[in-house]
Amino acid sequence: MDLSGCGTALITPFRADESIDEPALRALVDWQIASGIDWLVACGTTAETPTLTHDEWLRVIRIIAEQAAGRVPVWAGCTHNATRQAVENARQAAQIPGVTAILVANPYYNKPTQQGLYEHFLAVARAVELPVVLYNIPSRTGCNLEPETVLRLVGAAPNIAAIKESSSNLPQIGELLTRAPESFRVYSGDDNMALGTIALGGAGLVSVASNEIPREMAEMVRAAVQNDWALARQLHRKYFPLLQANFLETSPGPVKAVLAMMGRIEERYRLPMTPVSSATRARLERLAGELGLLVETPVPQR
């Protein structure tokens, strides 16, 4: 999978009745692409995917892939903590026109061994022909996908093409980049670790902040990939306070709050996600104002 740059892990906008806000989602896709984002991720962590029904999960992927219309690649998040269901999810997502890769995180809650992780990901990879992107996010899943296991998987399934590394463990990322084949892509899954990952040989970033600042994050990552480190550092320093503030509370709470301030979505969540606190909201509003993000954008008509 020859893909470098910045992809966005899209949020899922909801209405007051908690239904999916399809016009807002389609508008977000168009804005992301017009802003220079290199690919989109449907139904990842930032999308509140565990709160979606299976039919809603399929619908969100279809909407994003349909609206992207081949302009950028689309990765479909197919994570499940039951391997059988993860396999079925991957098979269903792979049939959606416009889906170009399958993203699968470690099974959450189960806390499998490395052998369990190996067999889980291998089963998913063998069920589809599309490239499979591993997704290591121990803080959410309760288990870490170790480099040795990744290397075993790469050797066993040729369509395991990449990993989204959200462990925030730079030595682990460095080990993986040192030992993996050059064709295997490593993407940072952490905005704050993007430049470090790219400096070690990573291919780019799957970003949360690019929901709010797609053009700026795409420019920062592109600069790093092209070895323009002066520009990359300049942009990172400018937007670092926002990258930090996005995790003052559980994501995507802060990101959705900022997008609502920008007029791009209604600020709606599904429990157990709740609106951010008044203190967090005040800090986000101040940062968004300082960064010039509060230009009014009408929420798409329904």
Swiss-Prot record:
EC number of the protein: 4.3.3.7
Keyword check for Lyase: yes
An example Gene Ontology CC term for this record: cytosol
InterPro entries referenced in this protein's UniProt entry, alphabetically: Aldolase_TIM (IPR013785), DapA (IPR005263), DapA-like (IPR002220), Schiff_base-form_aldolases_AS (IPR020625)
Pfam families in the record: DHDPS (PF00701)
Covalent S-S links between cysteines: none
Site for Part of a proton relay during catalysis, residues: 45, 109
PANTHER family: 4-HYDROXY-2-OXOGLUTARATE ALDOLASE, MITOCHONDRIAL (PTHR12128:SF66), DIHYDRODIPICOLINATE SYNTHASE (PTHR12128)
Protein family according to the UniProt entry: Belongs to the DapA family.
Protein name per the record: 4-hydroxy-tetrahydrodipicolinate synthase
